[in-house]
């Protein structure tokens, strides 16, 4: 599940928090929380989801949030009975009007935690901000609301608090509300959210058994909107059950300038790993997501900027892993590289039987890109 980053920008006048909104937009934040009179100003800055503190349906925000200036933030005393809470009544009324509703609660003590658990059952989002706590109330609320259709957004001040919130009780909050003016903190927190919940892949050594030129064919070059570094590339193979880590063109070469956004991935028939699924290389197009993987198995999402399919001389590479042979067909050129067991790129022109390269092997078959349990032989 993707984790989301909200930027809190409701204090002071517009110019005081415009910069943090702009930084959030540029860094890839998902939502901005502002006062109701600033919704349109945010929309003028860029395309981002807007949440607004309000008690009516006139703001035009994507998400209306109750609690500021009410019981949620402690401005007004809590009602002895949550059912009689003005925030609760307002949230229900706005939901009945078909709006997406959030509740904002500052957890000052146990009673506020209990109030948050109750109002959360009536809302689409529950935004909780701590005073002197780190984990326990969040754990309690995740447990209390696990059967409710509400997304918990935890207030944080930096990337370390964000990481803690997003990983609490394995599931973590669905997102965080960041309250910071520091551009570096905003960027680092967005990066934490992008990595959160994405498990490392287990890459293993595969022993090369064959390297053979196979003639001319069509190969796919994937130019992404992302800069890759040494050790990064994409998992590509002729079988979905076993894929080679094909290195990006991030290394300098005497033959051509580096292209750190590019992976010369393989022939048109090949599979490429995208999240938990696979796709054919030849299906990729601008705007599609791909998975960038490094030699240690860490994953991140990339965006396809362009795909080039061109006729080139090809080379078959086979490797043995777990007693099985896996294959890939790559362009026969010095700049096309796999990754050795030390995380170093190795050119297919230098590849020989007996070399060990990093591969991803899981066995099993695929049906429309999804893993299924069935007997299948791919040669």
Curated annotation (Swiss-Prot):
- Give the EC number(s) listed in the UniProt record: 1.4.1.24
Q: Does the keyword Oxidoreductase apply?
A: yes
Annotated GO biological processes are: amino acid biosynthetic process; aromatic amino acid family biosynthetic process
Q: Where is the signal peptide?
A: none
Per its UniProt entry, what is the enzyme's top EC class, as one word?
oxidoreductase
Cystine pairs: none
Reaction(s) catalyzed by this protein? 2-amino-2,3,7-trideoxy-D-lyxo-hept-6-ulosonate + NAD(+) + H2O = 3-dehydroquinate + NH4(+) + NADH + H(+)
Q: Which UniProt keywords apply?
A: Amino-acid biosynthesis, Aromatic amino acid biosynthesis, NAD, Oxidoreductase
Q: Name one GO molecular function term.
A: dehydroquinate synthase activity
Domain of life assignment = Archaea
| Main function | Catalyzes the oxidative deamination and cyclization of 2-amino-3,7-dideoxy-D-threo-hept-6-ulosonic acid (ADH) to yield 3-dehydroquinate (DHQ), which is fed into the canonical shikimic pathway of aromatic amino acid biosynthesis.
The UniProt similarity line reads: Belongs to the archaeal-type DHQ synthase family.
* NCBIfam families, per the entry: PRK02290.1-4
Write the protein's name: 3-dehydroquinate synthase
Protein's organism = Methanococcoides burtonii (strain DSM 6242 / NBRC 107633 / OCM 468 / ACE-M)
